[in-house]
Regions:
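Structural signature of the two symmetry-related core transmembrane helices
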Residues: 75-89, 168, 269-283
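Juxtamembrane intracellular "pre-TM" segments in multi-pass secondary transporters
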Residues: 1-6, 182-210
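Intracellular juxtamembrane helix-capping segments at the cytosolic ends
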Residues: 112-124, 308-321
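C-terminal transmembrane helical hairpin of 12-TM major facilitator-type secondary transporters
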Residues: 268-313
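Cytoplasmic helix-loop-helix junction between adjacent transmembrane helices
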Residues: 103-140
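Conserved MFS/SLC helix-loop-helix module at the cytosolic interface between two early adjacent transmembrane helices
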Residues: 59-95
């Protein structure tokens, strides 16, 4: 059972994480459609706009995590939220693709995810830590689902500027919530460990690889999906909320049973999830321009398996860390996550520019199958084997 202090801490952190991830995810289902109308826009620059957030976030996660270990979580999280706010403001007022890229880069530079996860771990006992991580995992899944409904609705009436104004409001609310949080002391004022030791730790490294590939595929895929829906199947952006909500609701058929069984056999669940994800992308490549029904089924299975992997990987990682280096470890993990976002946007934008939608769908199918084969050959998924 949570203590009253733990309940307050978990609630505040969960809300901040939800608002931040909602703001990050809302652009995914619509950016590749609306950014096409910006001055000097090209398919590659659209992909870069989507992915540059991940690059700057990946670069800044480790410094922010290190600083949060040294100066305290609250102070560093507030700095990150302020930087994110500035980037959102630039995105809201521009109609030039290059300034949009700059704004997105600043959004990513406010890299607080690792520090937030470390603060959550600091604020809960060992017995309650897994449950608190699961609560945050649910909030991330809810943010992901909500973003694919709210994003298209807001962009329908206000286009991208209105979307970024809403993100600004969410960020201001997050700052207010963090200001109400009890100040956290520094956990480590002596840097007596090596960053590279944490990066290459054999217990932690599989988690980093998993999240990198997972988000590379996700970002590439969502460069293609909005364009596929509008250009191939002539589905209006106005219909996106109904489309995405149907996909996410039906994906729970996959997600909920797997998450329920995850406590008993996490390794098996991760393997099953990755197999489902790989085959859904193979079918997407095969039928992306010929059969909307099969594409919808494939997306349902993809989102369901993605949600299981997205929740399971950080939960496993948290069991392998200690308090003194937790901020840095979670930030390294988040760096790989967002570097995957950058790679997905960069590679997806290039493939879309050079080969069209088929290039993106082929890439996501191939990389997911390679990931599956590597994991099966090593007999691990997300390093859960290591912790057995």
């Amino acid at each position: 059972m949570f203590t009253s202090v733990e309940k307050k801490s978990v609630t505040l952190i969960t809300l901040i994480y939800f608002f931040r991830m909602l703001g990050a995810f809302m652009v995914f289902p619509v950016l590749s459609v609306f950014a096409d109308s910006y001055n000097m826009s090209t398919p590659f620059l659209i992909g870069l706009t989507l992915g540059i957030y991940g690059l700057t976030n990946a670069i800044m996660q480790i410094p922010f995590g290190l600083l949060s270990d040294y100066f305290g979580r609250k102070n560093i999280i507030l700095v990150g939220l302020t930087i994110f706010l500035l980037g959102s403001f630039i995105c809201a007022i521009t109609d030039n693709i290059y300034y949009l890229i700059i704004g997105r880069a600043l959004q990513g530079a406010g890299a607080i995810s690792g520090a937030l996860m470390a603060l959550l771990s600091d604020s809960t006992s060992e017995n309650n830590r897994t449950l608190s991580m699961a609560i945050v995992g649910v909030s991330i899944g809810t943010a992901f689902f909500s973003a694919f409904i709210i994003g298209p609705v807001l962009s329908k009436y206000f286009e991208l500027p209105g979307l970024f104004i809403f993100i600004i409001l969410l960020t201001v609310l997050s700052i207010i919530l963090m200001l109400s949080f009890k100040n956290t002391p520094a956990k480590n004022t002596q840097f007596n460990f090596s960053v590279m030791d944490l990066v290459f730790d054999k217990r932690l490294k599989p988690h980093y690889i998993d999240i990198l590939v997972l988000h590379t595929v996700l970002t590439s895929l969502f460069i293609a999906i909005p364009v596929m829906m509008t250009d191939v199947y002539l589905i209006s952006v106005n219909e996106f909320p109904q489309l995405y909500s149907s996909i996410f609701i039906l994906s729970l058929i996959i997600t909920l049973p797997l998450l329920r069984y995850d406590r008993k056999n996490p390794v098996l669940v991760k393997n099953i999830s990755l197999i489902i994800l790989s085959f859904s992308l193979i079918f997407s490549f095969q039928f992306y321009n010929t059969n909307l029904f099969i594409i919808m089924i494939a997306l349902i299975f993809y989102i369901g398996s993605f949600s299981v992997l997205e929740a399971g990987i950080p939960s496993s990682l948290s069991k392998q860390t200690n308090q003194e280096t937790r901020g840095l470890t979670m930030s390294i993990y988040t760096s790989f996550q967002f570097f995957g976002t950058f790679l997905g946007g960069f590679i997806g934008g290039y493939l879309y520019d050079a080969y069209g939608l088929s290039g993106i769908f082929f890439f996501t199918a191939v990389i997911s199958v390679m990931w599956l084969l590597i994991c099966l050959s090593r007999n691990f998924i997300g390093a859960d084997i290591v912790s057995k």
